[in-house]
């Protein structure tokens, strides 16, 4: 008696399912990695844009377009004023900047009347709630940019006129503050 043996060619259902599961896991990892890469690229662009705004204000102070602050005071330049010279109107996230919370601060930390020692600070916020609080120029980096899905609470001081007091740096126990002597908004 002859036994009919099936000619086994191809894959079993279990083997096919295993391959599909492995491919799904690999795709999930790839998509997650790509999203993180895109988000980091947007944050880097956010910081680069902030640096361009700072450079524009630094040039404006040098050229006399913006007022050099007196000792211990600061000049605040709103982003909407800087946008005119840089051409940047939207954040990397595709939304306009919040005018009241996006500005450059020029602080004169000089000790004597005959010297000028300027420090530059920046605060940015867009209408999608991607932001960073008032930060010294040297501290601008990707890790300070937060987004709307962040659990970190943002406390950006709104500036709209002269006379406001800004806290520039509170690290080290003592706070550095300045009074806004000029507002370019």
Give residue ranges: language-model regions.
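Extracellular/periplasmic head regions of type IV pilus-like filament subunits
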Residues: 65-156, 184-185
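Short, low-complexity, Pro/Ser/Thr/Gly-rich segments in the mature regions of secreted, periplasmic
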Residues: 162-185
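Membrane-proximal N-terminal amphipathic helix
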Residues: 39-67
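N-terminal secretory signal peptides that target proteins for export/translocation
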Residues: 1-6
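Conserved short hydrophobic patches within well-ordered secondary structure
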Residues: 21, 27, 46-47, 53, ...
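N-terminal single-pass transmembrane signal-anchor helix
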Residues: 7-35
């Amino acid at each position: 008696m002859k036994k009919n043996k099936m000619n086994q060619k191809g894959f079993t259902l279990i083997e096919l399912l295993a391959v599909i599961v492995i491919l799904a896991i690999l795709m999930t990892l790839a998509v997650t990695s790509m999203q993180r890469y895109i988000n980091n690229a947007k944050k880097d662009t956010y910081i680069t844009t902030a640096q361009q705004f700072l450079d524009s204000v630094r040039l404006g102070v040098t050229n006399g377009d913006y007022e050099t602050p007196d000792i211990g005071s600061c000049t605040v330049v709103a982003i909407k004023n800087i946008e005119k010279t840089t051409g940047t109107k939207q954040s990397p996230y595709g939304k306009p900047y919040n005018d009241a919370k996006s500005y450059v601060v020029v602080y004169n930390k000089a000790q004597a009347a005959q010297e000028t020692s300027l420090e530059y600070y920046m605060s940015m916020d867009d209408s999608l709630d991607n932001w960073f609080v008032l930060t010294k120029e040297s501290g601008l980096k990707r890790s300070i940019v937060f987004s709307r899905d962040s659990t970190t609470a943002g406390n950006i001081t709104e500036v709209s006129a002269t006379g406001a007091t800004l806290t520039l740096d509170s690290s080290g126990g003592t706070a550095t503050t300045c009074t806004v002597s000029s507002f370019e908004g």
